[in-house]
Amino acid sequence: PNTPIPHHSPTPIHPSPFTPLPTHHHRTPMTDQPIFQRPTEATEALEKERQLPMTGWQQEVDQGLEYGLEGAASIRDRTIPTFSRGELPHYAGINTFMKAPYVEDVRKVGNYDVAIVGVPHDSGTTYRPGTRFGPQGIRRISALYTPYNFEFGVDLREQITLCDVGDIFTIPANNEKSFDQISKGVAHVFASGAFPILLGGDHSIGFPTVRGICRHLGDKKVGIIHFDRHVDTQETDLDERMHTCPWFHATNMANAPAENLVQLGIGGWQVPRQGVKVCRERGTNILTVTDIMEMGLDAAADFAIAKATDGTDCVWISFDIDCIDAGFVPGTGWPEPGGLLPREALYLLKRIIRETPVCGIEVVEVSPPYDISDMTSLMATRVICDTMAHLVVSGQLPRREKPSYIHEEANMEVDQAWT
């Protein structure tokens, strides 16, 4: 944890997406336009799309026509039903995440590769509330997205099964009862074998989500990669376990060692000294935005991967939307200028997910009442969709069987009693 961090790393193995590659192309004297000596990302994307199936799309069309009735006689496109029952039109339909099937019977969640879980809890906030509406806001704007990503060559509809199990029933103004609900819900989804994606909610949910994971790890360990501007390591805030406190309590559990907690993007004027003291004493691994910029994105990703996976069996990602510069994500409880650019955060996420055994992710601190034109909710949607794409590209999804780190029997005593 106390390993010095080089400020000038050697040329990374993975070239930065923002670094010019002059050796890979030359200019023609006639047009002065670059001619690439290797396929461009766009060229590769065109070929990847050719290789994707259309099976899922056709199934959606057939089901839409069966359940939603064939369109009126005047409709020339005969894939359009009378009642909207699929992706289109984007402005219509019931707002599950990306219009995924709603699974009312959560006992069947294990039949899917990925489960979206809403956690509408903001009783842990210490300033601006509203994150209880985060799941609604994210789901609503997610209808803007298609299941296909051009650059990645991934079509989620064709390559994985996605469901939305709705929201955990949280208790307003009672963190501890809400935490119990969250831990039970997360443990259920995790143990089923479905990959859990949580829509927060304030960051106080970080503790109960990790507790839910740890209940089904047996003697295995989980590393935590935490994107944030704030350390969130106080024992209490305002006399309770608030959104400034999740990692103090999560790393009290033997399954989630503090030395495997990596905190990316920390900095600014909202980092309480009590939390800094805990980071120092427990040896967490912090990189500021300046560290990341001076090291380079690849060196920062290498650092995060090495620390989070050292002696652990899987990695939990906790993505606080305020790690991104406040100009891009105004709809959050504690906006802090000077954060990561969206493309920087997304690149780090890409490297981390493609190179670690990820067991789940939460996206927290989206507060729609403070948002502008759904910017923040859309950023959260992008993080979630990119996560699923990288899991597909890296071969982690779809799962042929449950990962070996999932322990069938629950251990309800993973955390220390706290009053």
Each language-model region and where it sits:
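Low-complexity proline/serine/threonine-rich segments in eukaryotic and viral proteins
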Residues: 1-29
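Conserved alpha-helical scaffold segments that buttress catalytic/binding sites
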Residues: 31-419
